[in-house]
Amino acid sequence: MKTLKLQYHKHDIKIGKRCDFVPPTVTESCLLEYDGEVIGFYLTDLPDKLKQYITIANKEFLSKNVPKSLLERSDVYEMQRKLGISRKEAMARNTVQMSTILGAVLAKPHLRRPYNSVSAVHTNEKAKTFIKAMLLSCLECEKLIEKYMPQQYKLQKKLIEETTLPKYRFGNLFTSSISNFNIAAPFHQDRGNLKHTVNAILTKRKDTEGGALCVPDFQHTFEQANNSLLVYPAWFNIHGVTKIIKHNEDGYRNSLIFYPLAGFDK
């Protein structure tokens, strides 16, 4: 597999800015090297076993079996205000966005939950197939990380063992998972993650374009094709998801993400 040597570029993009549609610059499988180190990789095609697992996970995620949180973007509210239409009408004219979290969830005192916990989805019997498929997908991703980034695998496994109680682990390298339906996240940095770790981002999509990961520091946008995997150090710098364009009503772009949060040592 070829190696893409990344270089830092100055820019004026700030956290919170929405990411416009940008054609992808990285469309082939490659290792990502920065400052002499492999910091991630992109695979445009996956091993059959992993493909099978994420197909099952995606099917379940799209079904009513899996509880989801509905996210309402600012443009829904803006459309309501400008056109004087109902929330339902505004949502119908925009792309519905939903997400589901598995694994560990950090304490949220402002929501009267001053303690760490495990996602309530794990108690939902109808979601069991989804949870199993996601965990198996996670373990297969870890095998690929061990294959392409053996030093990172050892480091991250050790970090999780040293900082995360067993009940808060998702696989061996992560604490949590989030599945996103049509979410084009604005520029952000995963500051809550353990430092010196990587996220694993699987993509399932149908009849859409956009929804690529844009990293302004490196002036690159990763395609995130159907059945692809992007392994990236999300704690390291800002990144955002480009605008998702649906070609028909059934179109979607789903990301199935595994990530390692800090703060689960008690």
Q: What do these predicted ranges mean?
A:
Residues 1-200, 205, 221-222, 242-266:
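Fe(II)/2-oxoglutarate oxygenase catalytic core
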Residues 204-225:
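A short beta-strand-loop-beta hairpin characteristic of the jelly-roll/cupin
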Residues 215, 240-243:
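A generic "cationic amphipathic patch" detector
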Residues 202, 213, 227-230, 256:
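Structural signal for hydrophobic/aromatic residues that build the beta-strand cores
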Residues 197, 206-210, 236:
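Coil-to-beta-strand transition motifs
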